[in-house]
Amino acid sequence: MKELIKNWIPFSHQNKEKDTFKDVPKFLLSGSHRLGAATINSDIDGVILVARKGYWPTQFENDFFGNFECISKKCLNRENILKEEGDLNEVKEDYSLFCKLCENPQVENLRRIYGRVPIIGLKFAGFEFDLSFVTLEEELLNKFFKEENSLTVNQLDEVIEKFREEMPNIYFEANNETIIRLRLNTLLGMIYALSGVRSTLRFVELLDKNINKFRLAYITVKLWAKNHYIYGGKFGFLNGSSIAVLVSKFVLENSNKSLITIIMELFKYLVNYWFKLELDEEKIIVVETPKDYENTRKIVDWNLDKEIKQREEHFKNLLKERFEKHSKTLWPIILPGFPTQNTGFNINGSTDLIIKEEIKGGFDKFRILEEQFKNLLKNRDVDNSEQIWKDWLNGGKFSDKYDNYLAIICLHTELSSYGPQFCEFTETRIRLSLLSIVENKNPRIEYCHVSPTKYLDNKPCPKEFVEKRFLDWICNVWIVGIKGSVVEINETLSKNIFRDFNKLRRGKKLKLSDKKKYRLETKFFVKDELKKIEDVLYRN
């Protein structure tokens, strides 16, 4: 990936001869891979750095996302995508990274992901990548980013401060809806991407000699959360960043303790103390209190009062009279970034109940296995250590957790221009759609629990989920467990997501013919029906 980025000449630099092109784009590794704590299926997070050459929204669009579509490994002008299948006019004026990736034979599942930090998602050479984009003054690039491994927290803080000086303070006061509507996320996303790298570097500095203990504890807790279906920030659950903060806090406070003790203390703290706290300053979980750039941090850093206000406005607009359950739920787990950010922002009243229930169950199970763990510590039962850990990590099958399930089915033809993007967009809307359309309109439903792992991921549609005429389409399926009485859901969920997707295109034309090539459907199952489907689909 680094070589691919290095050999790419962005649109904003196309007026330079290739031989004299010196402002080479850079790939900056972030996330769990930089921490050395990646698991087998961890995404590789990267920040693409490009020398600034113009107005930031224009450069973002031209250099990063581009304006063309990726169809059959060709980057094509939207206006030149004809209705007749197979008649595609190739145009070569888009020099964006999106198009550079589109035409690479090792790239699969390429998509633009609009959000607080806009990213390009893809699979490259078998690995999943999430790429964000930052433009910096050429002087800063040359000064601090010649050697990635030599980058320090202080250097990155200086870069972020200079970047921040060019931004109006009001940008940091905007709520998420305003940020997306005014496209401020293209600029704010850049500073948050740099802040994410800063957090990773700071974790390494703080943990120092305890970094290996942290890595083991982090991977263990992450696997536990995944196996218990509460790992996935976009669905309102824990994510890699929140687990990193929680684990690093307990490694730093128990640096001389064993891995088992550290994890036990973390779960004990959450269940016996933190879950019972009122929402005030005492509940905020941090691993450092930064002292530098105090005046700037007063403007840009996360703030409890501001988030409470934003959550109240957000959920009041979304849910009307039943908003308090979610607006008053807050998990303030703060990354050591610049600006600081709350990793638990997406957690709501429903996912809060689910996470707490699973963590309490994990703590109870830990206590049952405590004697076996004590023997591990004394090296008396080493031969059984693998099985003891498996017993604790095992979260069972999702299809056993609830009596009723809802399948959210996004399907498209193989030739659909926008189908893959629509399904990607659908995934980002599931969390809030379940609150506003399913739970809010059905008081007998206590909560909905979406399994963060797709049931089907870009697979041929099976007859168990679609009508016969769609069996040659591609399916993405999410399964939602329902706690409470089930009432049939009408087409509102599908219609709302379609409407929001069309708004997101911001006036860019959607061919009528392509609108018929992707769909969103829902289907109910009881537990036994879902288990029978599993037996058919996964019998091999």
Spans of model-derived segments:
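Non-catalytic helical "accessory" subdomain of NTase-fold nucleotidyltransferases
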Residues: 1-540
